[in-house]
Amino acid sequence: MNLGLNVKEIERYDLVILLMAVALTCFGVVMVYSASSVMATKKFHDGFYFLKRQGVYALLGFGVMAVAMRIDYRTWREYAVPILLGCLFLLFLVFIPGIGGAAKGASRWIRLPGFNFQPSELTKIALIVYMAYSLDKKQDKVKFFSTGFLPYMVLLSVVLLILLKQHDLGAALTMGLVAIIMLFAAGTRPRYIIAMGMMALPILYFLVMNVDYRRRRILAYLNPWEDPTDTGFQIIQSWLAFGNGGVLGQGLGEGKQKMFYLPEAHTDFILSVTGEELGLIGVTVIAAMFLMLVLRGVRVALMAQEPFGRFLAFGIATLLGIQSFVNMAVVTGLLPTKGLALPFISYGGSSLIVTLFAVGILLNISTRLKGAP
């Protein structure tokens, strides 16, 4: 397979999606350096520590995206089942001593030389590919409970139980939402989804309120000022960052909250640093870029030539939309903390590489739209 791309070949792809993905990734590398340099200097005696790693992740991600762009998306339909089974196997590997890695009480990573891989990130794409394959196969049968709803709920329950065992409620909720939205778009009867939601609410309440750190997050979300030095500390510092930034920002690299005030400044709360340094204008531009990317993804889904491509593109666009919206809502205090990275921008190799891989698939679908030669 020739991976070289000439100008005419590039023009076949949705250039808006391509440009948004590249621009957000490059911006993310810059912001990771800005948000992490002080901490990296103190912890590793190298202010460029996270910048160098994120730069490598970005290059790897661009390479993976370039490969995915050239692979006919219909190829993934043939391997949907083994890919999903492989990802489920990887999810189990994190529990094996010596292979799995833990941090802050959560077992979510597989230790690789120089790199910790988070299989839940790849499982998100595997689940979307499988659901697109299955929904395409079932067609009108998706309207029936026994064939078009129950099997997906069983599969989803298995995946979510594994993720909850890893203490990864954020990934579990994300996958659940993406799956439900895909089912709704495919024609599943709304009453099934509503009934499932009503049954899930008490379970979700138990999962949150029965676990101390999750319960404290909810209480901090409702009233962070009740405990401003502990559970409410992170969101208060995030608000201070946005407040310091105002409309125009303090200037790139000039933020103060990243100086050990704001926890997770270069990961989950990197948008807060962006708000402090680039202001409301900078955050608005980033939000607009995400919105444009998601809308173009939905456009690709609507114009796809056949159902598998339609469901696959819609699932990827939905995933990008949910993850970016939830992260932005968390850092502004609209939602309780979830531990979800901001796609393309937050520090992290697994998230960035898998996200660019998904964009590559979306770009390939964009070359095979209705009316295209």
From Swiss-Prot:
InterPro entries: Cell_cycle_FtsW-rel_CS (IPR018365), FtsW (IPR013437), FtsW/RodA (IPR001182). The chain crosses the membrane at residues 15-35, 48-68, 80-100, 144-164, 168-188, 192-212, 278-298, 311-331, 342-362. It holds the Pfam family FTSW_RODA_SPOVE. GO terms for biological process: cell division; cell wall organization; peptidoglycan biosynthetic process; regulation of cell shape. Keywords: Cell cycle, Cell division, Cell inner membrane, Cell membrane, Cell shape, Cell wall biogenesis/degradation, Glycosyltransferase, Membrane, Peptidoglycan synthesis, Transferase, Transmembrane, Transmembrane helix. It is found in: Cell inner membrane. Its EC number is 2.4.99.28. It comes from the Bacteria. Pathway: Cell wall biogenesis; peptidoglycan biosynthesis. One of its GO terms (molecular function) is peptidoglycan glycosyltransferase activity. It catalyses: [GlcNAc-(1->4)-Mur2Ac(oyl-L-Ala-gamma-D-Glu-L-Lys-D-Ala-D-Ala)](n)-di-trans,octa-cis-undecaprenyl diphosphate + beta-D-GlcNAc-(1->4)-Mur2Ac(oyl-L-Ala-gamma-D-Glu-L-Lys-D-Ala-D-Ala)-di-trans,octa-cis-undecaprenyl diphosphate = [GlcNAc-(1->4)-Mur2Ac(oyl-L-Ala-gamma-D-Glu-L-Lys-D-Ala-D-Ala)](n+1)-di-trans,octa-cis-undecaprenyl diphosphate + di-trans,octa-cis-undecaprenyl diphosphate + H(+). One of its GO terms (cellular component) is plasma membrane. It is a multi-pass membrane protein. Belongs to the SEDS family. FtsW subfamily. Peptidoglycan polymerase that is essential for cell division. PANTHER family: CELL CYCLE PROTEIN, PEPTIDOGLYCAN GLYCOSYLTRANSFERASE FTSW-RELATED. This is Probable peptidoglycan glycosyltransferase FtsW.
